[in-house]
Amino acid sequence: MFRPLVKRVVTRRFLAAANNSNAHIEIRTLEDLAKLQSLDNVDPKLISKLINDKTNELNIKNELQMLKQLQAEEQKTQETSLKKFVRPAWIFLLMGSIVYLSCHYVWWKLDYEEKELEYTHKVHQLESELAALNEAHNSSVSSDKNSKRSSRKWYKFW
């Protein structure tokens, strides 16, 4: 009969001592709250204030970490920005060279054909002049021969 009574009294004293120890502990952080056995004697406003403070602290840490990551990514993109344009620059130079050389070849070929036509026309013109001069020369030579033969005496031929 006394045993259950003693057990109850000891349990109550232990709980009262625990509550008194909670009252004497100064609560400043959530870790202090975690050390307590119960939150019965703790002001709810204090709990919400501690939770809000910890949340703000974690948010600030996350924002700082995110800013550091953004700065690192920005530096990385600034370093690799030149690398992004090297291959397109080579492709542009190659394509430009191909276009330039093909246009130059077409221009050269057209110029060659134009000069070839001009030179063939000039050759035909000079050939006709040469033929006319040759014909004129032959006719003058034959007339000179005829005139020389007539002026010679017939016996001089022998």
Curated annotation (Swiss-Prot):
TM regions (residue ranges) = 86-108
Keywords annotated in UniProt: Chaperone, Coiled coil, Membrane, Mitochondrion, Mitochondrion inner membrane, Transit peptide, Transmembrane, Transmembrane helix
Superkingdom in the source lineage: Eukaryota
Signal sequence bounds: none
Location in the cell reads: Mitochondrion inner membrane
Q: GO cellular component terms?
A: mitochondrial inner membrane
- Keyword Transmembrane helix part of the UniProt annotation: yes
Its name, as the record gives it, is: Inner membrane assembly complex subunit 17
Its membrane topology? Single-pass membrane protein
Q: Which organism is it from?
A: Kluyveromyces lactis (strain ATCC 8585 / CBS 2359 / DSM 70799 / NBRC 1267 / NRRL Y-1140 / WM37) (Yeast)
Keyword hit for Chaperone: yes
Describe, as the record does, how this protein assembles with itself and its partners. Component of the inner membrane assembly (INA) complex, composed of INA17 and INA22. Interacts with a subset of F(1)F(0)-ATP synthase subunits of the F(1)-domain and the peripheral stalk.
- Coiled coil region boundaries: 110-140
Q: Which residues lie on this side of the membrane: Mitochondrial matrix?
A: 16-85
What's its job?
Component of the INA complex (INAC) that promotes the biogenesis of mitochondrial F(1)F(0)-ATP synthase. INAC facilitates the assembly of the peripheral stalk and promotes the assembly of the catalytic F(1)-domain with the membrane-embedded F(0)-domain.
- Mitochondrial intermembrane side stretches: 109-158
The record's similarity note reads: Belongs to the INA17 family.
Q: What range does the transit peptide cover?
A: 1-15
